[in-house]
Swiss-Prot record:
Species this chain originates from: Thermosipho africanus (strain TCF52B)
Superkingdom of this protein's organism: Bacteria
NAD as UniProt keyword: yes
Protein function: Modulates transcription in response to changes in cellular NADH/NAD(+) redox state.
GO biological process per UniProt: negative regulation of DNA-templated transcription; response to redox state
Entry protein name: Redox-sensing transcriptional repressor Rex
Gene (name only): rex
Keyword Ligase: no
Record lineage: Bacteria, Thermotogati, Thermotogota, Thermotogae, Thermotogales
Binding site for NAD(+): 89-94
Stored Gene3D superfamilies: NAD(P)-binding Rossmann-like Domain, Winged helix-like DNA-binding domain superfamily/Winged helix DNA-binding domain
InterPro entries reported for this sequence: CoA-bd, NAD(P)-bd_dom_sf, Rex_DNA-bd_C_dom, Tscrpt_rep_Rex, WH-like_DNA-bd_sf, WH_DNA-bd_sf
Record key words, sorted: Cytoplasm, DNA-binding, NAD, Repressor, Transcription, Transcription regulation
Length: 207
């Protein structure tokens, strides 16, 4: 039976990977859990505990080989290959994501953006042209699509998800403020939670 990995651990893996990337670019060959922890503002014991879910890493007294650990995390996270992404919803959030070049650098390649509003169809967003949602079947026939970003109104979200699941999408990043009914992996994003967390820290003078 596969070990269940807590969600906070999964989120921190991406932070570790980004940190190691920067360390490698700085020419640092070996790194200790303490070094990673200090850069991320967490405890070194947390770094070691998180990594232990996936096996043994590093050598006592030497630390981790930066490049080797980065490669291992690439395999674990799944960023050792490119993922094709589409965006559903060409409003402010959807347009910003489709136009964000940082995703491509992290191996998430946005290849299409769709909307049901015909007034938005044909608009150019970055290097993409907005297509009508009715064209999505044909798009899936011609392209391999693995991840969808959902940036649609709450009342349209479930209908869109049902269609995407029918087409064989593998995962969804959901910006709609609704719990989706689906059997595929979903990552819900609510930016208001970050603001609430920040206001909590400000009120209590927490770093």
């Amino acid at each position: 039976m596969e070990k269940k990995i807590p969600r906070p651990v999964i989120k921190r893996l991406g932070l570790y990977y980004r940190c190691l990337n920067r360390l490698y670019e700085e020419g640092i060959e070996y790194v200790a859990s303490k070094d990673i922890a200090e850069r991320l503002g967490i405890k070194s014991s947390q770094v070691r505990k998180d990594l232990s879910y996936f096996g043994e890493f590093g050598k006592r007294g030497v630390g981790y080989n930066t490049y080797e650990l980065m490669e291992r995390l690439e395999d674990i996270i799944g960023v050792n290959k490119y993922w094709n992404v589409i965006v559903i919803g060409a409003g402010n959030i959807g347009s910003a994501i489709a136009n964000y070049e940082g995703l491509r650098k992290e191996k998430f390649n946005v290849i299409g953006i769709f909307d049901a509003d015909r007034s938005k169809v044909g608009r150019k967003i970055g290097r993409l042209i907005v297509k009508h949602f009715s064209e999505i079947d044909d798009f899936f026939k011609k392209n391999i699509v693995e991840i969808a970003v959902l940036a649609v109104p709450e009342n349209a979200a479930q209908m869109v998800v049902d269609k995407l699941e029918e087409l064989g999408i593998k995962g969804i990043v959901n910006f709609a403020p609704v719990k989706l009914r689906t059997n595929i992996p979903v990552e819900d994003v609510d930016i208001t939670l970050s603001f609430k967390s920040l206001s909590f820290k400000i009120e209590r003078n927490i770093e």
